[in-house]
């Protein structure tokens, strides 16, 4: 079970959004590399990064900030936002990103996901961000007419490393993860699922470690870490204890 600390990038800064709204961004750190270093020092073992500007632009925008983080941490980093073609996938993996997350293109161009996953086994994940049950695209600015489960099932035998499932309605609001929808997705597909959106407290970490969540690979923590509602040491100690049991 992995707890991924999140760094969302906007204008080269580390921010958190509310419900994916770029107009409701709170800056938490002007220096993403310093934030990444801090997460590493706290004991986290895998970093989750999103290029928010890239998600809207359809191409990498905060490359300089991402590269600055790669220089200061040795832990693996997964990256999403603006990854819409094979060249971008190849470019990020060559620069040291451990796993790329394909979101909009997974809906618009499923062949890209399959091609990338085949070429780079274990290094391609799919990001499914749902609003009212339907997957949103283009940096959450548009809603599609397909469900997360429908998209996930397209990639069952494609070699996708993980699915990051985000409930947009809860993202950045500290309302708790949508366990019902997340676990239902995890039980319906063989691809490992990572919970995202709304992680609020140590109670969510405990839920992550409960038997009903045993098909999940982990969860992403954002605002709860930044505003002190989740103590990294307590959360990681719980996970370590569960791993040792």
Curated annotation (Swiss-Prot):
Catalytic residues in the record: 8 (proton acceptor), 129 (proton donor)
Record family assignment: Belongs to the HisA/HisF family.
Pathway participation: Amino-acid biosynthesis; L-histidine biosynthesis; L-histidine from 5-phospho-alpha-D-ribose 1-diphosphate: step 4/9
Main subcellular location: cytoplasm
Enzyme nomenclature, EC number: 5.3.1.16
InterPro entries registered for this protein in UniProt: Aldolase_TIM, His_biosynth, HisA_bact_arch, Isoase_HisA-like, Isoase_HisA-like_bact, RibuloseP-bd_barrel
Cellular compartment(s): Cytoplasm
Highest taxon above the source species: Bacteria
Gene Ontology terms, MF aspect: 1-(5-phosphoribosyl)-5-[(5-phosphoribosylamino)methylideneamino]imidazole-4-carboxamide isomerase activity
Keywords assigned by UniProt, alphabetized: Amino-acid biosynthesis, Cytoplasm, Histidine biosynthesis, Isomerase
Keyword Transferase recorded: no
Catalysed reactions, semicolon-separated: 1-(5-phospho-beta-D-ribosyl)-5-[(5-phospho-beta-D-ribosylamino)methylideneamino]imidazole-4-carboxamide = 5-[(5-phospho-1-deoxy-D-ribulos-1-ylimino)methylamino]-1-(5-phospho-beta-D-ribosyl)imidazole-4-carboxamide
Name used for this protein in its record: 1-(5-phosphoribosyl)-5-[(5-phosphoribosylamino)methylideneamino] imidazole-4-carboxamide isomerase
GO process annotations (BP): L-histidine biosynthetic process; L-tryptophan biosynthetic process
A cellular component term, taken from the record's GO annotations: cytoplasm
